[in-house]
């Protein structure tokens, strides 16, 4: 790859590189860059700009909050034709050397000029993990919410159908971020399951939607837990949604239990780099 020698130059950007990123969000003030804060986007920008030796525009599929993790976050970066010559192997090795150990680029794709990790996403999927038992989770503790009391999963599952479809999710949005902005979203899937991580049984809540509001998934989880604790019945979920009022919903669940699991794109748009 022939990298630009002048960091201040403006090259002709004829294509897009797309990176699939995983990270442990525990040490970061969220994904989005913030002055004076350590963020996932800031670390990615520093690493990619070091390799390309120029400033970049970086777009993500979804901005995760402080403490939230990702298995398959996607970012897009406009590049030159010459920069496309950098091989997949070189990208992965360089990013492994340049990124902190809690952030990894797991795959590199090329895409058309103008492709956006955010605006070309068809849907995004999150999973929230809960350890609802007396015993403290040990090896999985950084990625689950330890809820010491057992939850009625059947009751919580009965509330999930109310979440499906396109509707106003303002009740689950951080108040300040909803001012003057649209709060309608479409949820395609909301379901509970179980998994075993490091020998520990984990309750999972997976939700897929076209997009999500600030703190939306965590507030939905907090509301479902109220139902799982028998403080409310499953029909309450419908009342919360219809209220369009943050005070009507349950508390926001801790960030540590939430993981951004993936993004759905048109499969013809992304081609794995050679």
Give a label for each model feature:
Residues 2-274:
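Structured-RNA-binding interfaces characteristic of tRNA pseudouridine synthases
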């Amino acid at each position: 790859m022939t990298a630009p020698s002048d960091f201040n130059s403006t090259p002709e950007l004829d294509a897009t590189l797309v990176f699939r990123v995983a990270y442990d969000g525990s040490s970061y003030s969220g994904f989005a860059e913030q002055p004076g804060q350590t963020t996932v986007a800031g670390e990615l920008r520093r690493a990619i700009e070091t390799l390309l030796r120029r400033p970049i525009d970086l777009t993500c599929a979804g901005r995760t909050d402080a403490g939230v993790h990702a298995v398959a976050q996607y970012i897009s970066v406009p590049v030159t034709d010459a920069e496309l010559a950098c091989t997949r192997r070189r990208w992965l090795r360089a990013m492994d050397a340049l990124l902190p150990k809690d952030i990894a680029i797991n795959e590199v794709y090329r895409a058309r000029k103008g492709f956006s990790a955010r605006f070309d996403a068809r849907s995004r999927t999150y999973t929230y993990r809960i350890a609802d038992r007396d015993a403290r989770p040990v090896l999985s503790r950084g990625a689950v919410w330890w809820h010491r009391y057992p939850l009625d999963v059947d009751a919580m599952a009965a509330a999930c159908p109310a979440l499906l479809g396109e509707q106003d999710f303002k009740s689950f949005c951080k108040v300040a971020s909803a001012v003057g902005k649209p709060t309608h979203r479409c949820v395609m899937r909301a379901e509970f399951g179980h998994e075993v991580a490091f020998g520990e049984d984990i309750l999972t809540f997976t939700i897929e939607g076209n997009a999500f509001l600030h703190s939306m998934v965590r507030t939905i989880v907090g509301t479902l837990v109220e139902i799982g604790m028998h403080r409310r019945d499953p029909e309450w979920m419908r009342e919360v949604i219809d209220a369009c009022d943050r005070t009507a919903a349950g508390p926001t669940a801790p960030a540590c239990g939430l993981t951004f699991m993936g993004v759905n794109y048109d499969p013809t748009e992304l081609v794995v780099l050679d």
